[in-house]
Design a protein with these regions (language model features):
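Intrinsically disordered, low-complexity segments enriched in small/flexible residues
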Residues: 1-4, 145-346
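Conserved catalytic cores of soluble enzyme domains
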Residues: 63-193
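Hydrophobic/aromatic residues within transmembrane alpha-helices
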Residues: 23, 60, 76-77, 132-133, ...
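Short, histidine-centered active-site or binding-site loop motifs used for metal coordination
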Residues: 25-29, 95, 241
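Conserved CoA-thioester-binding segment of acyl-CoA-metabolizing enzymes
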Residues: 1-61, 313, 319-332, 336-346
Length: 346
C-alpha cells in the first residue's frame, strides 16, 4: 500500500510503495501548472530517491481537465524511458505565439524529431494527438485512459526497476497505434520541403507556395496561426532549434536559460508581456508585437538575446546528458502517466 510522503494539500505529492516511487502533480485549479514551488518539490523528491537504494521505479502522474501537454509538463514527459499517453493527450509547443521561445529542453528534443517536424511544431504551435506523439517519438506507449489505474497498480506491485520487466507490464496494457490518414505526420514531405529553409521568411514563402497546390488545404489555417506569432519570437525559436541540432542537452538547457532571461528582461522588446496580456489578462487575442513584421526584426537584436552571460551567471547543469534521446539511460526507470496533460506556469 502506497504511503503518502507529503501534506495532501501540497502542490506535489510523493508516495512510496515497495521499490516504486510516485510523484503526483496536485494543482488542479491551476491546471497543474509547473510553478517554482512545484520545481522545488520535484527536486526534493528526486534527489532523495536518487540516493535511496530501495527506489527502483519512479512514476510521474500528470492529470488535468483540458488535455493539453505543453511547456514544462511536456518536458517532464518526453525524456522519460517510458512515456505513456492516452486518447485524451494533446501535445503542443506554442511559446512563440506569446512572444517566448521553445524552452524546457525542446530546442534539443525538437531538433531530434523526424525531419523538420520540430521546426514545424515550434513555429506554428501545431498540436499532436497521442497517436502522433507515439509516431514522432515524443511518447513510447498508448494506453486507454480506462486502463491507467490498473496499470499503475501493476507497476506499484513490481519489486524491480528492471527495464524489461517494466516494459512487459506496460505492453500488457498498451495498444499499437498509427497516425490517422489526415495526420500531419503523413505530410512530412511538405513540412521538410518548407521548414528546412534557412529563415522564417523563406519558410513562410515556401509554405505559401505549397498552399496553392490541390490537396494542401490544411496549410491555410496553419499559416494564419504562424503569422499571428511574435516575429521576434519566431526568429529566436528557429535559431535555437537549428543550434540545438549540434548541441548537447546541457548546452541546450544553458542556451534556453539565457534566452528566457534575456526575453524576460526585455533586452530587445517586451513581446512576451504583450503576448501574456493578450492571451491571459485582457484575453483579446490581439497582441501588438514590436516590431510587427519579420522584415523589421534586426539580426543584431537576435544576437543580443543569444549573447552568453558571464560564467557565474550561466545556468549550471550536469555535464551528463543521459536520457532517452541520447540513447543512454540512468539505472532507475521513470514512467510518465499522462491521463490528460500539463503546462508551464511562468
Amino acid at each position: 500500500m502506497a504511503q503518502q510522503q507529503t501534506n495532501p494539500e501540497e502542490v506535489v505529492l510523493g508516495q512510496e510503495a515497495g521499490g516504486a516511487r510516485v510523484i503526483t502533480l496536485n494543482r488542479p485549479r491551476q491546471l497543474n501548472g509547473i510553478s517554482d514551488r512545484v520545481v522545488y518539490l520535484l527536486a526534493q523528491f528526486l534527489e532523495k530517491w536518487e540516493k535511496d537504494e530501495n527506489a527502483k521505479l519512479v512514476i510521474f502522474k500528470v492529470a488535468l481537465v483540458n488535455g493539453l501537454v505543453m511547456g514544462g509538463g511536456a518536458a517532464m514527459v518526453a525524456p522519460l524511458k517510458f512515456a505513456v499517453v492516452t486518447e485524451k493527450t494533446i501535445f503542443a509547443t506554442p511559446e512563440a505565439s506569446v512572444g517566448l521561445h521553445t524552452d524546457c529542453s525542446f530546442s534539443y528534443i525538437h531538433s531530434r524529431l523526424p525531419g523538420y517536424l520540430g521546426e514545424y511544431l515550434a513555429l506554428t504551435g501545431a498540436r499532436l494527438n497521442a497517436k502522433e506523439m507515439i509516431s514522432a517519438g515524443l511518447a513510447t506507449h498508448f494506453v486507454s485512459s480506462e486502463k491507467l489505474e490498473e496499470l499503475e497498480k501493476r507497476l506499484l506491485n513490481l519489486d524491480t526497476g528492471d527495464e524489461s520487466a517494466v516494459r512487459a507490464v506496460i505492453e500488457e496494457f498498451s495498444t499499437d497505434v498509427q497516425p490517422d490518414e489526415d495526420s500531419i505526420l503523413n505530410k512530412l514531405s511538405t513540412i521538410n520541403k518548407c521548414f528546412s529553409a534557412e529563415t522564417v521568411e523563406d519558410i513562410i514563402k515556401a509554405f505559401e507556395s505549397e498552399a496553392s497546390i490541390d490537396g494542401n488545404q490544411w496549410i491555410a489555417p496553419v499559416l494564419k496561426g504562424l503569422r499571428r506569432s511574435s516575429p521576434t519570437a519566431l526568429k529566436i525559436t528557429l535559431r535555437s532549434i537549428r543550434e540545438g541540432r549540434k548541441q548537447s542537452l546541457p548546452e541546450c538547457l544553458t542556451k534556453e536559460f539565457r534566452l528566457t532571461m534575456n526575453i524576460l528582461r526585455s533586452v530587445v522588446n517586451g513581446d512576451v508581456y504583450e503576448g501574456i496580456r493578450a492571451l491571459s489578462i485582457d484575453k483579446d487575442n490581439a497582441p501588438k508585437w514590436n516590431p510587427t513584421t519579420l522584415e523589421e526584426v534586426k539580426n543584431e537584436d537576435i544576437d543580443r538575446v543569444f549573447q552568453p552571460f558571464s560564467s557565474e551567471q550561466e545556468l549550471q547543469v550536469p555535464s551528463d546528458d543521459s536520457n532517452r534521446w541520447a540513447v543512454t539511460y540512468s539505472p532507475q526507470i521513470s514512467v510518465a502517466h499522462i491521463t490528460h496533460g500539463s503546462y508551464l506556469d511562468s
